[in-house]
Amino acid sequence: MEVTVSNLSYTFSPKQPLSLDHVTLDLPKGSRTLLVGANGAGKSTLLKLLSGKSLAKAGHISVGGKDPFRESSSAFVYLGTEWVNNPVIHRDMSVARLIASVGGDKFAERRDFLISILDIDLRWRMHAVSDGERRRVQLCMGLLRPFEVLLLDEVTVDLDVLARADLLNFLQEETEVRNATIVYATHIFDGLAEWPTHLVHLSLGRIVDYGPISKFGALMTRSSTGNSALLETCLEWLKEDKKNRGTREEEKRSTWDDVQESLKVGTDVFTDYFKISRAK
């Protein structure tokens, strides 16, 4: 499905700056788009709006010709970091039961393949797994049903190198064989040099640049540092973002001297713990 965004603006509060500022995008069906931007650039906000989890009050969003907020579909899949904080998936239950609850029997072949590439042990108990293992289960559950649009927000952060590489290969095949569309926000660029078909650079809620990978010709070659040219380019973008962000916000930032007086007032049991433990 094609993903189209036109003149999209969004703020969490009228008193706050825009989290997204007149964003316009057109991502074709079957594309693999990498969202690049510093923390606070608006990547997560954009993905949640595309998934229909939040209402776009200014501008227009179309996913496969539909408004994702008003016309939700099981073909639209959003996977974000907040899932691991859900108390339900920290209970003493088997991984097999959890996977079965979302259609594990209906998509048996796909289930077995995902369990294999994500290296999931069906004997795991959810209350006793690591963060990385819990993330693998989330990905298996989220990818179990064939999707048409997949929105990923930092969900590979807990995966080891092998699991992440196998997952990226699987996702690439999904776009090439089934013509699915993927939008992926991450700060981990290892192994991505030849993965994306499109790049989007977000900074302070605005699109700095975007387009097919062919538009960024230098990315197709390797840099002299040994890093992929994609990684080097993203690093340069993020450095420039930080520089611009600092210039615009410098007057708003407090110095350590500014907050000294507030530290003298009152007490806190949590910070007192650190004072005592570090004093030993």
UniProtKB/Swiss-Prot annotation:
Compartments (UniProt record): Cytoplasm; Nucleus
InterPro entries assigned: AAA+_ATPase, ABC_transporter-like_ATP-bd, P-loop_NTPase
Gene Ontology molecular function: any one: ATP binding
ABC transporter domain span: 3-229
Gene3D superfamilies for this protein: P-loop containing nucleotide triphosphate hydrolases
GO terms classed as biological process: nuclear-transcribed mRNA poly(A) tail shortening; regulation of transcription by RNA polymerase II
PROSITE patterns in the cross-refs: ABC_TRANSPORTER_2 (PS50893)
Residue numbers binding ATP: G37, A38, N39, G40, A41, G42, K43, S44
Keyword check for Disulfide bond: no
Segments traversing the membrane: none
UniProt xrefs under Pfam families: ABC_tran
SMART domains per UniProt: AAA (SM00382)
Keywords of this entry: ATP-binding, Cytoplasm, Nucleotide-binding, Nucleus
Origin: domain of life: Eukaryota
GO cellular component terms listed in the entry, alphabetical order: CCR4-NOT complex; CCR4-NOT core complex; cytosol; nucleus
Keyword ATP-binding annotated: yes
Protein name (Swiss-Prot/TrEMBL): ABC transporter domain-containing protein C20G4.01
